[in-house]
Amino acid sequence: MKKIVTLTVLLVLAIAASADTAEILRTETTKNLKENLLPFWMEKTVDPQGGFYGVVLNDGKAIENAPKGAVLNARITWSFSRAYRQDGLEVYKQMADRAADYYIRHFIDPVYGGVFWQLDCEGHPKETTKQTYACAFGIYGLAEHFRATGDRRSLEAALKLYQTLEEKVHDKGEAGYIESFQRDYTKAPLKGVDGQANASKTMNTHIHILEAYTTLYQVWPDEGLKKNLKELLGILQTKLYNPRTNHLILYCDDHWNPIGEIDSYGHDIETSWLMTEAAAVVGDPVLKKQVDEQAVKMARTALKEGLNADGAMLYEKSPEGMNRRLAWWPQCEAIIGCVNAWQLTGDQSFLDVALKNWTYVKSHFVDQAHGGWFKDLTEDGQPLNAPKVSDWNCPYHNSRMAFELAERLAPALVHTEVMAWSNITGVRLEGELIDFESSLRVGTMGGEMEKSGREKLQHIRYTRDGHTQKTITPMHGAEFTQTVTDMDQQTVALHWLAEAKADLDEGAWFCMTLPSSHYAKAKINIQKRKITIIAPERKITLSFDRPVTAITKDEEGDKAIYITLLPTLKKGSTAELAATMTVDGMRHHETAEIAIDLTKPGRVFAGFGGNFRIQNPAKDPLVIDYCLRNMRVAFGRVEMPWAVWDMQGAEAPHVKHSAEMARRLKEIGMPVIVSCWFPPSWAGDQTTRSDGTARAFHLKSTGQQRIFASLASYLEFLKKDYGVEADYFSFNESDLGIDVVFTPQEHCDFIKAFGQYLADRGLKTLLLLGDNSDATTFDFILPALHDPTAHKYIGAISFHSWRGCDDVTLKKWADASREINVPLIVGEGSTDAAAHQYPSIFNESTFALYEINLYTRLCAVCQPWSILQWQLTSDYSLLWGGGIYQSTGPLRPTQRFFNLKQLAMTPENAFAVPVVCNKENINAAAFTKKASGEWAVHLVNNGASCEAVISGLPAGTKEVAVYVTNSHSHAEVRLLKVTDGRLSVQLPAESFVSIITAILQPCK
């Protein structure tokens, strides 16, 4: 028994050590990438005359007349494309776009294909020989640019380069790829990139064709390309590999006869992980096993023979001896290769070597004074006077190291769904939701009980710190602080601090409600320190740090577990409780069958829209500019600042900002809604909202003509001074009273009277029926809906999506719009009207998934003309950083932004069509535009990863673009082929996937 305990302890310690080492590597390399490496390249290398400088010295000085290399520019394209794909920063995209555009326009040979090896400083061809190595990097960079941005031009250029390699370079008789050619692809006795005149097939070129084809296959999974990948892997397993020494063969002739005896340690360990990656992409398990075994052997050998005493990787060994020069790139590849070998074997020594190498790199290669990395060091670690930027020295090996480690070493954790009001709605295992709903409760058992819940509480707080979510929830008589920490793939750490704020004969509990849909047959076992819940497809265990009092109750058909925190509230008394929750359950990876019926077009979808109510003139423009620049916005809603207009007129800053916003939207070409919140004091009597919660204003019936004149004067001012004739007008949420409140009949009467007034003034502006605070108050629109004399003044029906969006209610709204033949608009779109009180929630993937689920359902069920996001400003912002809600770091898009960008890719004015899915945790919406042949399908996967088979697609469709957004993918795109109207597509866990026929070019 002692041996078992000892082994268990050692195993736990080993796992902890691996986790600590991995986290150091991940965080430190990422920090260097973002704070040193990428900034150096953005600040020092951009050539104002076009593209990038060909040479930058160690001190950061550019040599302006230096030639520009193809490899350098392709690697810049790749590095910043990958950076944008990982982090979504617009500055990275700008660099990537600049690099890709320059590469396509200048480096690609328009006559013979392939790429020029070198240009002069003005971008004209200088060295026109065709090196296959350079062509491979062109494919690599451009395919990554397409993957990150969706720019079809980059993919088309990459495919042409691929075609050139296959037609002119690929040796189909003896396999492999020839090294060098003249410009017109006639063969000549030219030196390859490694300087071997008689070597026509080289290891270096083949491994980089492998990496290029691997990336290309990830965005364009073609069977011919897959065959090429298998051939390349076979070559690296046989013709270019010595199984006796576990080294690669660097140089061969046409017939694969080896030339020379050089062992290149950096290339060996780089190839080890490139082969592993390629084999995984190919998807052949037998091949993958073979490759993995070879990769580990190559890594072990390279480390054994190539590391110096400091843990740095030496360059190479030849018959003349060891080359002890220390170059930057072998260090990067050694670190990735070690991490890859550790992942394949679990051998901690690989991770230890990676950390030692990184420790050396950051103290010797990273230039703390001038930024960037040194290219080469002497044997004793002193920098050599080699340029930081040159044909070969690029932000590729070192940036790729950081990208790979960020992806590979991200901790694999459960994902606990915590609402801002403290309720836990479940724990996700590999995306599968093990659902329950927790709540905090104060009251008496069997009597009145206050429960934490959405929009039930004031002054709640939500924050995240790493993997820990913290909520502070004030309730009557008590305040609760709850922390929830995702620990590993099955474990969550919970902690509660309950503090009594008053003397009450009541108690405080943490409760878990188990829905009957999954727990009707559950067995619940309560012990002093442990609660176990076992149901057919799930198991939950709670282990507490002290004995607890717990009971179960039946509540409305569900089971509820009450765990006592404070048995009685005595002011100042506190109680703490900690628990470890472990969860397990069925992951549903079954294939989803999705069928679309294009023969039954419904209502038109103009596109996604937004609210642009200016409330923060300092921050709003940053978000507005970004949104309008980076996604298609089809509909806009702005504020009429009535009270300010009435008091200060056209020169008031708020009036100007609002009017300028309206003009900007109208110039883009979208319909504009003008909505009013605050009336001037003379126009209304103070009253309460319809729910009695706060003040509102009831318009004075005796001042109707003055009210109408004031409102119309603003609309005329917009038309005359700003060129904007408002398409629609509304009082915001007048069903509730934010801030003008109507009864249903008053709303009807206002539409008729003000509608006629506008017509008499020659304004074409129509009224919104409703613009309700949520979907539940449908009856508010009934008087006008049933009054034919009101219909001619109604331009559209509008509701806000904050509450009540069940299928039955949504269909009522859809039916109402059809009844009077006007469009339906979701005037304010999102899920939580109180979220501005706890804005950290906007950056949560849970919030993003809930929001896009709602929008997908809205599109499918009630088919609105547009959904107008609340907002596309810094309020409820889709961006984070830049001081928005006190967030730090650069301004950057959140997962929510990329979700909405994908939805906004729906073809303009496409028609909603029926779509059904056999999996309940997938929501779907589909659109078609028959005249142009365009269509789109949007899928939200709320569960584990699975394959989806979509049928009913247009028979003429050959390929589609598939975009994926989730917590780690930002509208990442690939092309897939459609066969006979059917498409098979992978749906990652907790993801929003859009399948679109027309690939939109990036916004300019």
Where are these regions (language model features)?
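Substrate-binding cleft and catalytic face of glycoside hydrolase catalytic domains
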Residues: 112-117, 597, 630-786
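Carbohydrate-binding surface patches
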Residues: 332, 339, 343-344, 917-958, ...
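Acidic (Asp/Glu-rich), glycine- and aromatic
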Residues: 487-527
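Acidic-aromatic substrate-binding/catalytic surfaces of carbohydrate-active enzymes
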Residues: 415-474, 478
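C-terminal beta-sandwich/jelly-roll accessory domains of carbohydrate-active enzymes
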Residues: 940-1004
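Glycan-recognition and catalytic cores of secretory/periplasmic carbohydrate-active enzymes
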Residues: 19-414
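Aromatic/acidic polysaccharide-binding cleft in carbohydrate-active enzymes
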Residues: 376, 826-901, 914-919
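Beta-strand-rich recognition/accessory modules
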Residues: 476, 503, 535-593
